[in-house]
């Protein structure tokens, strides 16, 4: 059996987005599952829109996702000589030809066809045929080069996601494979690349379905083996509309910036249009072992932000505390927060991780242990009632001698509220707001224990 070779071939006209990342993941996983090779190819022939920054963004995104390639990255702009060589071979063997039809002539042809309610298409006026007399080539019109598409029969393939797909060759006109300035076109370059690189399986978005029959015909004309195709359905946003920039994250790296873990994103992407029974949470290695093309759904996948957040929290809770603390430390350092003069960050993240679904949310929560807290006056007024002030003062006095552990602090709070005839929240809520600036925290005794006796005493003194 021929070794599996897959490829991811993005165009560097923007960031690596979720759809592209899923395509890359599925292509990578299929190669890994079958012990094959995963090739990275940058399709940068759109010179006007391709940028070095976009190339770097793609490479950064692939690295962050951990989708290492075995070969590449290959750049189409560096393969121009090869494309032109193949075009000359096709001209020589009659599978391509020069076309001198001008833009004005094509526009007139289109208008005529539309007036007759016909599908606009090239009429083959420069296509060589047995017994057909061609016009004399004009000297003032630089020609394009067209592929001589078969005129009869069908082009078909068994798509691994969508099933059998057929196109009548009469629906396909003679594709331009080289522009008038000599530069080869996208569909042609893709064919030569897949041929030269020995690609066996093409996994890509279903926006390429209409390109596939053209590419198959070109590959056959080249004498190349046609790869197996799997076209992935689109991804919809939370609202059921096609996923786009307005749904939030525009690039994979934005998920990193927003505090998502790589493994959570990988796990989530894997479930976007593929399933293994009812399994929701699985490792990268388990995904590779399970992944196949048979269980990719042909219907559109719907992005669910809440599910991604749930998964992210799950993976955060699975991290060793030291590793989780290191990730939060990096975010706090970037904010200019010094954690040297506060409690053990490892203990802080363990205390708050159950309430945090991203690293950023966790960093926000624990930052109060290392920064000066100024409670919102409205929040303070809402939770610090006049009848609670004597209890607050007594608690502040009691912390000087209490054993500095959460159970002992909890006992002091209960003793104080009982003595003053109050319910627990009457004292616990103002303590939360004064010490952390937050109305919602983990157990207040655990928070107080972590902040430290001296800082708690000094902070409470300012409100008595």
From Swiss-Prot:
Membrane-crossing segments per the record: none
Span(s) of short sequence motif 'KMSKS' region: 242-246
Short motif ('HIGH' region): ranges: 10-20
Gene Ontology MF annotations: ATP binding; glutamate-tRNA ligase activity; tRNA binding; zinc ion binding
Entry keyword set: Aminoacyl-tRNA synthetase, ATP-binding, Cytoplasm, Ligase, Nucleotide-binding, Protein biosynthesis
This protein's GO CC annotations: cytosol
Entry-linked PROSITE patterns: AA_TRNA_LIGASE_I
Pfam families attached to this UniProt entry: Anticodon_2, tRNA-synt_1c
InterPro entries documented for this protein: aa-tRNA-synth_I_cd-bd, aa-tRNA-synth_I_codon-bd_sub2, aa-tRNA-synth_I_CS, aa_tRNA-synth_I_cd-bd_sf, Glu-tRNA-ligase_bac/mito, Glu/Gln-tRNA-synth, Glu/Gln-tRNA-synth_Ib_cat-dom, GluQ/Sye
Biased composition (Basic and acidic residues): 113-130
Residues that hold ATP according to the record: 245
Renumbered residue ranges of the record's region Disordered: 113-142
Family statement: Belongs to the class-I aminoacyl-tRNA synthetase family. Glutamate--tRNA ligase type 1 subfamily.
HAMAP family named among the record's database cross-references: Glu_tRNA_synth_type1
Record function comment: Catalyzes the attachment of glutamate to tRNA(Glu) in a two-step reaction: glutamate is first activated by ATP to form Glu-AMP and then transferred to the acceptor end of tRNA(Glu).
Subunit annotation: Monomer.
Protein name: Glutamate--tRNA ligase
Organism lineage string: Bacteria, Pseudomonadati, Pseudomonadota, Betaproteobacteria, Rhodocyclales
């Amino acid at each position: 059996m021929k070794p599996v070779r897959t490829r991811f071939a993005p165009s560097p006209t923007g960031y690596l987005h979720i759809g592209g990342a899923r395509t890359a993941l599925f292509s990578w996983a299929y190669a890994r599952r079958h012990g094959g090779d995963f090739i990275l190819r940058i399709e940068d022939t759109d010179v006007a829109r391709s940028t070095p920054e976009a190339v770097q963004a793609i490479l950064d995104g692939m690295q962050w996702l951990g989708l290492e390639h075995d070969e590449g990255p290959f750049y189409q702009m560096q393969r121009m000589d090869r494309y032109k060589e193949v075009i000359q071979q096709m001209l020589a063997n009659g599978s391509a030809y020069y076309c001198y039809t001008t833009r004005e002539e094509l526009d007139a042809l289109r208008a005529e066809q539309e007036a007759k309610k016909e599908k606009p298409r090239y009429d083959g006026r420069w296509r060589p045929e047995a017994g057909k007399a061609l016009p004399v080539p004009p000297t003032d019109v630089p020609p394009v080069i067209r592929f001589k598409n078969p005129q009869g029969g069908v082009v078909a393939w068994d798509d691994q996601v969508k099933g059998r797909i057929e196109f009548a060759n009469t629906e396909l006109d003679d594709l331009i494979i080289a522009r008038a300035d000599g530069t080869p076109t996208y569909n042609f370059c893709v064919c030569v690349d897949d041929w030269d690189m020995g690609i066996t399986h093409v996994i890509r978005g279903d926006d390429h379905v209409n390109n596939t029959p053209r590419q198959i015909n070109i590959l056959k004309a080249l004498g190349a083996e046609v790869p197996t195709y799997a076209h992935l359905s689109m991804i919809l946003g939370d609202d059921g509309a096609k996923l786009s920039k307005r749904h939030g994250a525009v690039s994979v790296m934005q998920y990193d910036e927003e505090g998502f873990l790589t493994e959570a994103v990988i796990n989530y992407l894997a479930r976007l249009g593929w399933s293994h029974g009812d399994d929701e949470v699985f490792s990268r290695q388990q995904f590779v072992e399970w992944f196949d093309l048979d269980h990719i759904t042909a219907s559109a996948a719907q992005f669910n932000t809440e599910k991604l957040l749930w998964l992210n929290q799950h993976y955060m809770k699975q991290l060793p505390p030291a590793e989780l603390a290191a990730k939060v430390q990096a975010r706090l350092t970037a904010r200019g927060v010094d954690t040297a003069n506060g409690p053990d960050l490892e203990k802080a993240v363990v205390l708050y991780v159950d309430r945090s679904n991203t690293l950023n949310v966790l960093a926000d929560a624990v930052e109060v242990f290392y920064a000066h807290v100024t409670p919102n006056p409205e929040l303070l007024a809402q939770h610090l009632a006049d009848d609670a002030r004597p209890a607050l003062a007594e608690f502040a006095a009691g912390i000087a001698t209490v054993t500095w552990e959460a159970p002992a602090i909890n006992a002091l709070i209960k003793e104080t509220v009982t003595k003053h005839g109050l319910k627990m929240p009457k004292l616990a809520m103002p303590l939360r707001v004064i010490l952390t600036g937050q109305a919602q925290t983990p157990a207040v005794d655990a928070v107080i224990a972590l902040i430290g006796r001296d800082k708690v005493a000094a902070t409470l003194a300012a409100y008595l």
